[in-house]
Amino acid sequence: MTEQKNKASLIEFPCAFPLKVMGAVHPEFEQAVLDTVRLHAPDTQAHHITTRPSSKGNYTGATVQVKVENQEQLDNIYRALTSHELVKVVL
Protein backbone atom coordinates (compact mmCIF):
# COMPACT_ATOMS: atom_id res chain seq x y z
CA MET A 1 0.00 0.00 0.00
CA THR A 2 1.13 3.50 -0.64
CA GLU A 3 1.50 6.03 2.15
CA GLN A 4 -1.47 7.99 0.75
CA LYS A 5 -3.73 4.93 0.96
CA ASN A 6 -2.57 4.27 4.54
CA LYS A 7 -3.44 7.82 5.56
CA ALA A 8 -6.83 7.64 3.88
CA SER A 9 -7.72 4.43 5.69
CA LEU A 10 -7.16 5.97 9.13
CA ILE A 11 -10.06 8.43 8.87
CA GLU A 12 -13.45 7.66 7.40
CA PHE A 13 -15.11 10.67 5.78
CA PRO A 14 -17.41 12.42 6.39
CA CYS A 15 -16.78 12.61 10.12
CA ALA A 16 -16.70 14.90 13.14
CA PHE A 17 -13.01 15.59 13.68
CA PRO A 18 -11.62 17.10 16.91
CA LEU A 19 -8.98 19.71 16.12
CA LYS A 20 -6.66 20.62 19.00
CA VAL A 21 -5.29 24.15 18.72
CA MET A 22 -2.78 25.86 21.01
CA GLY A 23 -2.18 29.56 20.80
CA ALA A 24 -1.56 32.88 22.40
CA VAL A 25 -3.43 34.11 25.44
CA HIS A 26 -5.41 36.75 23.61
CA PRO A 27 -9.01 37.97 23.93
CA GLU A 28 -9.65 37.23 20.23
CA PHE A 29 -8.06 33.76 20.11
CA GLU A 30 -11.30 31.76 20.30
CA GLN A 31 -13.06 33.89 17.68
CA ALA A 32 -9.99 33.83 15.42
CA VAL A 33 -9.88 30.03 15.53
CA LEU A 34 -13.61 29.78 14.88
CA ASP A 35 -13.49 32.25 11.98
CA THR A 36 -10.52 30.45 10.42
CA VAL A 37 -12.21 27.05 10.64
CA ARG A 38 -15.43 28.50 9.19
CA LEU A 39 -13.57 29.51 6.02
CA HIS A 40 -13.41 25.80 5.16
CA ALA A 41 -16.23 24.37 7.29
CA PRO A 42 -18.99 27.01 7.31
CA ASP A 43 -21.36 24.88 9.43
CA THR A 44 -19.04 25.13 12.45
CA GLN A 45 -20.80 26.96 15.30
CA ALA A 46 -19.61 28.61 18.52
CA HIS A 47 -20.79 25.64 20.59
CA HIS A 48 -18.35 23.40 18.67
CA ILE A 49 -15.33 25.04 20.33
CA THR A 50 -14.11 24.75 23.91
CA THR A 51 -11.13 26.62 25.33
CA ARG A 52 -9.01 26.36 28.45
CA PRO A 53 -5.81 27.98 29.71
CA SER A 54 -2.56 26.01 29.81
CA SER A 55 -1.36 24.84 33.23
CA LYS A 56 0.99 27.82 33.59
CA GLY A 57 -1.38 30.25 31.89
CA ASN A 58 1.02 31.04 29.05
CA TYR A 59 -1.17 29.61 26.28
CA THR A 60 -4.79 28.92 25.45
CA GLY A 61 -5.91 25.50 24.26
CA ALA A 62 -8.94 24.99 22.07
CA THR A 63 -10.75 21.92 20.82
CA VAL A 64 -12.98 22.39 17.79
CA GLN A 65 -15.33 19.65 16.62
CA VAL A 66 -15.41 20.07 12.85
CA LYS A 67 -17.54 18.13 10.38
CA VAL A 68 -15.15 17.33 7.54
CA GLU A 69 -16.15 15.81 4.23
CA ASN A 70 -12.73 14.76 2.89
CA GLN A 71 -8.98 14.84 3.47
CA GLU A 72 -8.50 17.92 1.30
CA GLN A 73 -10.90 19.94 3.44
CA LEU A 74 -9.13 18.80 6.62
CA ASP A 75 -5.73 19.69 5.16
CA ASN A 76 -6.99 23.15 4.18
CA ILE A 77 -8.24 23.77 7.72
CA TYR A 78 -4.87 22.72 9.16
CA ARG A 79 -2.99 24.99 6.76
CA ALA A 80 -5.24 27.96 7.51
CA LEU A 81 -4.91 27.50 11.27
CA THR A 82 -1.15 26.96 11.30
CA SER A 83 -0.64 30.13 9.26
CA HIS A 84 -2.67 32.27 11.70
CA GLU A 85 -0.54 34.60 13.83
CA LEU A 86 -2.29 33.69 17.12
CA VAL A 87 -1.92 29.93 16.60
CA LYS A 88 1.20 28.08 17.75
CA VAL A 89 0.31 24.40 17.22
CA VAL A 90 -2.50 22.41 15.59
CA LEU A 91 -2.98 18.70 16.27
Swiss-Prot record:
Q: Which SUPFAM superfamilies match?
A: YbeD/HP0495-like (SSF117991)
Which Pfam family, any one, appears in the UniProt record? DUF493
Family matches, as InterPro entries: UPF0250_YbeD-like, YbeD-like_sf
Q: Which residues form the signal peptide?
A: none
Concerning its family, UniProt says:
Belongs to the UPF0250 family.
Q: Which PANTHER family match?
A: UPF0250 PROTEIN YBED (PTHR38036:SF1)
Q: What is this protein called?
A: UPF0250 protein NGK_1021
**Whose protein is this, by species?**
Neisseria gonorrhoeae (strain NCCP11945)
Question: What does UniProt list as this organism's lineage?
Answer: Bacteria, Pseudomonadati, Pseudomonadota, Betaproteobacteria, Neisseriales
